[in-house]
Amino acid sequence: MPAQRKLGRPTDQRKAVLKSLVTALFQNGKIETTEAKAKEVKNIAEKLIAIAVKECDNFTSKQVKVSAAKLDSKGNKITNTKKSKNGNEYLVVEREIKTDMQRVDNPSRLHARRKVMSWLYRVKDSEGNTINLANKLFDEIAPKYRDVQGGYTRMYRIGPRKGDAAEMVILQLV
């Protein structure tokens, strides 16, 4: 018996389809697809969520110095004129240094994040901003399932598809 369903496609196409379905599931919370694809996506999604739940709180915080340009009331950079050694004048942007707290992944969480990212595509929202689905998985989805042992997804049968009568299902995060 094969480890994964073949889905009637070559390996590269099959992985691309599964990767896009897993990405859509984590981005939207639910997907509508055929039963065979849904069973494969469910298997992959359950494993990724289990990894994220295990490594959910495995990070440290550290202080980082951040340099940023000073802005005036209109949002423009504040500049000063300086003279070089040979007498030329040039503009220099004023900068301010702040210290911010930044989260740093521990090695096992970093490995888990990279495993998860291997199954997710980069996606953008309607305004064109990039959404980091790995962050969403570790920061929003995994904490909801902290006390749950498996069963993170649910499948509903919605009947056969018109045209080829393939059994269609809705796969959603519980």
From Swiss-Prot:
Gene: rplQ
InterPro entries found in the cross-reference section: Ribosomal_bL17, Ribosomal_bL17_sf
Keyword Protease: no
Protein family: Belongs to the bacterial ribosomal protein bL17 family.
Database matches in Pfam families: Ribosomal_L17
Listed GO biological process terms: translation
UniProtKB keywords: Ribonucleoprotein, Ribosomal protein
GO MF term set: structural constituent of ribosome
Assembly, per entry: Part of the 50S ribosomal subunit. Contacts protein L32.
Keyword Nucleus assigned: no
Name of the protein: Large ribosomal subunit protein bL17
Lineage: superkingdom: Bacteria
Recorded GO CC terms: cytosolic large ribosomal subunit
